[in-house]
Amino acid sequence: MGNELRHRTVLLDEAVESLVTRPDGVCVDGTFGRGGHSRAVLARLASAGRLIAFDKDPRAIETAQGIEDARFSIVHDSFASMRDALAARGVEKVSGVLLDLGVSSPQVDDPARGFSFRADGPLDMRMDPTRGESAAEWLARASVQELTEVIRDYGEERFAFQIAKALVARRAESDRLGPLDTTGELAQIVGHVVKTREKGKDPATRTFQAIRIHVNQELADLQVVLDAALSLLEQGGRLVVISFHSLEDRIVKRFMQAHASAPAVDRRLPIRAVDLPSPPLKIISRQFPSEAEVAANPRARSAVMRIAERVTP
């Protein structure tokens, strides 16, 4: 069975129902993946509707090119390029933006992509293997301080400093052992350092997450695309974001809350509340996968979906 067939889209019906409020509108799928959300969006759009999808992964682009629908187009780039990419296509406003964050099952399950500590493979971790610096290349040059900061901040790993020192010590042995360039060896190094075990988690989980986030600039791109989505959404348009770990969800939560609240004003100033600008967003809901979905797809367990609506022009 192919990777595409093994991928299960999380919160499929809930996300699409929240996103498509105007069937003749322009929707954006910021993370095409293997097309689960995009195909469901197309099924809900009217003939005058339009869907523009983004993805960095060349394999996702290949899958997207198999969709023969005049309403659909795919952009081979990060969703961080959304504002410019839509402007180049003459799109000024959209009725919905969907972001399904993180890695897809086919990416994790393919050892050649270097995302997983469960199977040995090249230490790559790039969403787009044709662009940028691989995990192995970064590990070959990063200082103890940089390694510590990335593993601590992006992996929330309390043994970050010890892991960083072990990685630099391994690098010093490169002349004798060769470069650190496989996921198996990275997982082994981390496992030797992290002696405690979180229930249901491999000791390398946090470090792999941190390196992947750094290599792909995931959190920086998320900040950029949230700002872009806010400016692109028409009045009544929806922003729907599915995240899978606390770092992403925290950014999304704070963004939505900040733009759904009236600006703070010193109460000593003679400004009436009615004279303040209205916040551009209204928070609609926060949703989680059902027990049935988690039972069928355990990877959905950590998912949280946040929905906000643009309420000002």
From Swiss-Prot:
EC identifiers of the protein: 2.1.1.199
Keywords of this entry: Cytoplasm, Methyltransferase, rRNA processing, S-adenosyl-L-methionine, Transferase
Binding site for S-adenosyl-L-methionine: G35, G36, H37, D55, F79, D100, Q107
GO molecular function ontology, one term from the record: rRNA (cytosine-N4-)-methyltransferase activity
Location in the cell: Cytoplasm
Record's catalysed reaction(s): cytidine(1402) in 16S rRNA + S-adenosyl-L-methionine = N(4)-methylcytidine(1402) in 16S rRNA + S-adenosyl-L-homocysteine + H(+)
UniProt xrefs under SUPFAM superfamilies: Putative methyltransferase TM0872, insert domain (SSF81799), S-adenosyl-L-methionine-dependent methyltransferases (SSF53335)
GO cellular component, as recorded: cytoplasm
Location (main, coarse): cytoplasm
GO biological process: rRNA base methylation
Enzyme class: transferase
Role: Specifically methylates the N4 position of cytidine in position 1402 (C1402) of 16S rRNA.
Family statement: Belongs to the methyltransferase superfamily. RsmH family.
Record-given protein name: Ribosomal RNA small subunit methyltransferase H
Organism of provenance: Burkholderia orbicola (strain AU 1054)
